Design a protein with these regions (language model features):
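An amphipathic, basic-hydrophobic helix/alpha-beta surface used to engage anionic
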Residues: 58
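Pre-Walker A adenine-sensing motif
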Residues: 5-23, 44
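Conserved AAA+ ATPase small/helical "lid" subdomain
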Residues: 188-215
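Short secondary-structure boundary/capping segments
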Residues: 20-21, 109, 200
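Conserved P-loop NTPase motor cores
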Residues: 27-53, 63-68, 74, 85, ...
Length: 215
């Protein structure tokens, strides 16, 4: 049966520009690693690297906004916002920073004509339901999510782990790595091969493994 492609006729939000080809159109990323592993430094790199991520606004929810990485981002975006204001003669806010216990904005409230990056770093457990909504419904609102955690076991399987399409793993213990292999990798390689691959990456300082689970 020949099926006509009607998707171009659908009234859906559009991304005018895509991310770099290494990422899917909408990113739902879990970054897992212990304290000091390099999670936040990697996040800063992703946000600042030219032509890597396409976004109009970022929202950061973190219990550790006092750490140097977020202080640096505040200064970086503050300078950028001032430059844009001078050039375009209009006020603009790109970056929004919130303590982890603040009420998280509902994804349905975001402007679907803009690209958004949501960052959840060490957020309170009572906010997990709204974060699940971002992983389940975010693509309809041009949302990209980066969820930073110390352990994959602390992440709700339903919605978050099941809908994540990118995993960035810093060093994990064998139990956690085996669990991740069983749920995401076992169809592509056996555990010993996967562990060898990860160990090779983790030998480097702040080394990590990036796993894209998307077509």
């Amino acid at each position: 049966m020949n099926v006509r492609d009607h998707t171009k006729e659908f009234n859906v939000p559009t991304n005018t520009r895509k991310h770099h080809d290494i990422f899917p159109q909408n990113i739902f990323c879990v970054i897992a690693g212990s304290t000091g592993s390099g999670k936040t430094n990697l996040l800063v790199h992703l946000l600042k690297k030219e032509k890597l991520l396409n976004y109009n606004h970022i929202y950061v929810y973190s219990a550790t906004l006092h750490q140097p990485a977020y202080a640096h981002l505040r200064e970086y975006y503050g300078t950028l916002e001032k430059q844009i204001q001078q050039e375009l003669n209009q006020s603009i806010q790109i970056a929004h920073f919130f303590e982890a216990d603040n009420q998280i904005q509902n994804p349905s409230e975001l402007d679907t004509n803009k690209n958004h990056v949501m960052i959840f770093d060490d957020v309170m457990m009572e906010h997990q339901d709204i974060i699940k909504q971002y992983f389940c419904q975010g693509r309809h609102n041009n949302v990209n999510v980066f969820y930073l955690c110390q352990s994959l076991h602390t992440i709700a399987k339903h919605c978050i782990r099941d809908n994540a399409n990118v995993f960035i793993l810093f060093r994990q213990d064998d139990k956690t790595l085996k669990y991740f292999h069983e749920t995401h990798i076992s169809g592509d390689m056996d555990f010993s091969e996967f562990k060898q691959f990860c160990d090779g990456a983790w030998k480097k300082k702040h080394g990590c493994v990036v796993i894209n689970i998307w077509d």
